[in-house]
Amino acid sequence: MTAESVCLTLVAARRRRDELFDFLSEQRDLVAGFSASDCAGFGPTVRLPSAPEQVKGHADQVLLRIILEKPQADLLLSRIKTAFAGTRLVYWIMPVTEFGILDDRGPEADH
């Protein structure tokens, strides 16, 4: 990537998972792919809306990571802020110093 690469991280209530997946899949002009995993939210600002979450003491959440260039991250974040206003979705953007994909040829392919 020639422009500054960044990682846009999103954290939302797990019940929003499919909605987020659908939304990101529709952003083909900005998002080539993303990674997602389930996570647990802790802290004084985390809401525990369900009885199971209250018993466990943490919120069931989904965490998504998207690697893209900074201008595209800013545009995507603007769209997310509009589409998910009021949902308490948490986000942050961090620089990526290196990004790549290891191919399936293995180290012996270099010889």
Predicted regions and their residues:
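Positively charged, small/polar-rich N-terminal and surface patches that mediate targeting and assembly
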Residues: 1-111
